[in-house]
Amino acid sequence: MAGKDVEEEEPWLFEYKGTVFPGCTRKENLDAMPDFHIRDDDVIVVGFPKAGNHWCAEIINNVMRAAGKTTEATMDPEAPGRILEFDDEIADETRTNHRFLEGKPSPRLICTHLHREFAPPGVASPTGNTKIISIMRNPKDTAVSYYHFSTKLGDNEDDWGTFADNFLQGRWEYGDFYRHVLGWWELRDDPHFLFLKYEDMKKDMKGAVEKVATFLEAELEEAQVASIVETCTFRNLKVVYDKSADIGCRSIIARKGIAGDWKSMFTDEQNAAFDAKYEENLEGTGLKFDFE
């Protein structure tokens, strides 16, 4: 896509204020974000695509149900347990997604891949009691996972080498990885935020569930924590997702769910290029990733 108009080169993509977006995001939703109202009891998950957003949201859903923060009465009757998103199209063609979200019952669990600069003010600079969980994953595994996902979805027709270069240069969906993670990382000391890393969750799932529960002020028994850990293992969620007939791409969300899968795809040259970009962008920021 280098040197060419993104919409001419990849017709399912479009550029908005210098960032590449998939067509399903829709410009109307992005235009509406500065005025979108965030409620005090909203729980928001922010993360670059393929960072573990859905996995994190499943944990949150289960924690909130176990703590009695969501009940049958507060579940969305149109899609109980569904993960709502700012930046994705919905089946109802009569409403853009921000209008759809405005009518959803509280508490809402909303996921977004948006950079901080594109997010609603109530997420980018939160006040009140809104809870925001930022999920991050190392850029190499993120790129490999995104390649396989977008290829299965039919959005990507490039080979791995071309895709890896586009990802590294921020010429793929949602733009530059580092611009995204560092924008949210600036808020690491804000009490409205909890930051989680995919690799840490893989190493200590129980600890991740307990962190989420504490952050959401959800008092859980040990047995409830153990049940959530078992329910939200990659193995169990993959079975659910693979059989899903849900809207969109849920059935291809889960693939391997491991850390270090980048080694199966990266050439030495690609590895060196990704390492150089990593050091250039993260040196001195305090943000580090594990690659194993």
Where is each model-derived feature located?
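Catalytic lobes of large eukaryotic enzymes
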Residues: 214-255
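PAPS-dependent sulfotransferase catalytic domain
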Residues: 1-196, 242-260, 264-292
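An amphipathic alpha-helix signature
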Residues: 140-143, 206-213, 222-225, 271, ...
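PAPS/PAP-binding and catalytic site of the sulfotransferase fold
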Residues: 52-66, 196-220, 228, 236
